[in-house]
Amino acid sequence: MEGIIATFRSPGAELIELGTLTVRWYGILIAISVLIGLKLSTRLGSYRNINPGIINDLMPILILSSIFGARFYYVSFEWNNYNGVNFWSKVHLLGLQIPIPSFLEIWNGGIAIHGALIMGTISIILFCRIKKQRFWDVLDVLVPSVALGQAIGRWGNFFNNEAFGLPTNQPWKLFIPFSSRPESFSDQSYFHPTFLYESLWNICIFLILIFLFRLNIRGLMKLPSGALSCIYLITYSLGRIWIEGLRIDPLCLGGSPPFCEGGLRIAQLISFLLICLGSFGLWWIYQSKRKMPNFGITRNRKK
């Protein structure tokens, strides 16, 4: 058993080098998430009379805005690591060393899902206003893909040797090389694989959302527009509060890692607010007796 456990370690962030181009696992995982998300969202959108072209037009906007939001959110709380002498970095491209601001090096990690959710939601709101689409219906068909994409994307943390938890001797412990350990834990070798916990949690959320969606289109459960999105907010945030408590690299509001002593873990605070928002949203949706979405394509198939 110990021999099997010892192999649970990252093979490295880089998948392959093609000349001067380095293909990283994180990029591959994001690409896979996007492709699966596009296919799934288009499929679910057909049940709510959302034209596939709408999802296709939205996806690149959503991807870019989410990546920007995720990076901006992270850098905002970690600005000291990118300011001063660390402001500039160099990338190798076509045999050249090109100077760029270090906060643009997203391939080295340093993104926050809450930033992606905030900026992604803003982009969906603006898109739906311009395209005259029903915001809640569009959001409902996207959140299952978001949950699945998070489950896949979290493995990027594994390959980058980041976002791990406290030291542990559990059978599922994760080996972290010395160069990736925080100084205060340099004498420890095995840590909680918090990326794995969140990945599994997100898979469960994805399955729950798909199950509820299917019950809804079959008329077995009343799920007004927006309810699925609120359920996602609540379920994801509940898991994130617990998982974030295990991590030793949190973004802190006051205090400092690994325990944010004298301060708060920002992800836990945001998650708590999202639970409140999602709970209020569900109450409002059912209290106001919002209309059920129109499942035109399903009914057409039954004829």
Swiss-Prot record:
One GO-annotated biological process of the protein: lipoprotein biosynthetic process
Bilayer disposition of the protein: Multi-pass membrane protein
| Signal peptide extent | none
The alphabetized UniProt keywords are:
Cell inner membrane, Cell membrane, Membrane, Transferase, Transmembrane, Transmembrane helix
Instruction: Give the matching PROSITE patterns.
Output: LGT
List the GO cellular component terms: plasma membrane
Q: What is its main location?
A: membrane
Pfam families for this protein: LGT (PF01790)
Transmembrane ranges, per UniProt, are: 18-38, 50-70, 106-126, 193-213, 223-243, 266-286
Query: Which EC numbers does the record give?
Result: 2.5.1.145
**Protein family membership:** Belongs to the Lgt family.
Q: Could you tell me what this protein is called?
A: Phosphatidylglycerol--prolipoprotein diacylglyceryl transferase
According to its UniProt entry, this protein's organism is Prochlorococcus marinus (strain SARG / CCMP1375 / SS120)
User: Which gene carries the instructions for this protein?
Assistant: lgt
